[in-house]
């Protein structure tokens, strides 16, 4: 942007980029999540991270939720052997829980977070690309600026109020790659807290919608 006086020199809609094969097409599935978020503490316009983490990792229904996520992966993946995915989690503990659960059920996975060393991140990326692991479960990283074209599955494992974050995370799977026909997106949607504003979090003005 510095070369253009901090102005966009050009832009393209998401739909046009996909049609022109600049980005990968995607299939989006909203998957029912039986976890009830109605009683999770609401703080500063969002769910309390600790309470949400506890619900996803230590509650009675934590294993049941992880099992349903694994089933959805199997159901919506064209071939489980070819899956190379990123799962976006609410916390380090949640990412570690998901990776551990998948490893126990023969879906090799790694958890990464903002404290992970660069060599660990680079190693995880290589393993995902080569198929040595199926998933990277992450929090606070990989939202943007990460290039792993091989990613063909994206899991939204926590609610978000931010359209920007949602699009950034979706974008991790939109790069073109050899043998990659489309991206599979699984968004796990639960019963929300009554204060959760679906429209407010994802409302875009007319100009933004037109640019997509």
Regions found by a protein language model. Give the residues of each.
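Conserved strand-helix element at the start of the C-terminal RecA-like helicase core
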Residues: 55-103
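Post-DEXD/H (motif II) to motif III coupling segment of the RecA-like Helicase ATP-binding lobe
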Residues: 1-29
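Conserved helicase ATPase core of P-loop NTP-dependent helicases/translocases
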Residues: 86, 95-143
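SF2 helicase motor core recognition
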Residues: 21, 136-154, 170-175
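Short, basic/glycine-rich phosphate-binding loops at helix/coil junctions
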Residues: 34-55
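Conserved segment of the helicase C-terminal RecA-like domain
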Residues: 162-168, 172-204
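Conserved nucleotide-binding/hydrolysis micro-motifs of P-loop NTPases
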Residues: 1, 16-19, 32-37, 93, ...
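Non-catalytic, charged low-complexity extensions flanking SF2 helicase motor domains
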Residues: 205-212
